[in-house]
Amino acid sequence: MNKSLKEIYYQDVIPGLIEQFNYTNIHQVLKITKITLNRGLGEASKNNKILEASIKEFELISGQHPLINKARKSVAGFKIREGMPVGISVTLRKKLMYTFLEKLIHLSLPRIRDFRGVSVKSFDGRGNYNLGIKEQLIFPEIEYDQVDQVRGLDISITTTAKTQQEGIALLRALGMPFNDN
């Protein structure tokens, strides 16, 4: 029977990281604290259907209702007033986080056309990983017929790693398909 990503983490990844980085305390072991999904919706200020469609897609992808991000101040150049919706975001933790990451690694990323792995250069230098998805159609929950327009989203994986090497080791041990270029 296949193990879940959380079981793999506790049974395989933790002992491997303790050996690799010579940790003396179990609490020093790296872990993922949260995964944040974000989508900017500048055009949602003119068309409310775009906001509703994006909320529905995020609920399908993540399993929870997204937070609507509103403009903090008015910007005449972008035709945005204070309080208008400019994006949506979801923060996943615990069980939903592991479920989403497992689905992303094993189902969604391989569905990208000409996929050769994700870039190692997307780490922020402190062990956190950022990934931009160009189209929401790679997720199995999104049906092609239900999509009115192809929109992307940003995925941020926040870890307890202090360095980029630790972050790479953690995500690689969890099965993230990095390209080695």
Curated annotation (Swiss-Prot):
It is found in: Plastid, Chloroplast. Keywords: Chloroplast, Plastid, Ribonucleoprotein, Ribosomal protein, RNA-binding, rRNA-binding. GO terms for molecular function: rRNA binding; structural constituent of ribosome. Its main location: plastid. The gene is rpl5. SUPFAM superfamilies: RL5-like. It comes from Guillardia theta. InterPro entries: Ribosomal_uL5, Ribosomal_uL5_bac-type, Ribosomal_uL5_C, Ribosomal_uL5_dom_sf, Ribosomal_uL5_N. PANTHER family: 60S RIBOSOMAL PROTEIN L11-RELATED (PTHR11994). Binds 5S rRNA, forms part of the central protuberance of the 50S subunit. GO terms for cellular component: chloroplast; ribonucleoprotein complex; ribosome. Part of the 50S ribosomal subunit; contacts the 5S rRNA. Belongs to the universal ribosomal protein uL5 family. GO terms for biological process: translation. HAMAP family: Ribosomal_uL5_B. It comes from the Eukaryota. This is Large ribosomal subunit protein uL5c.
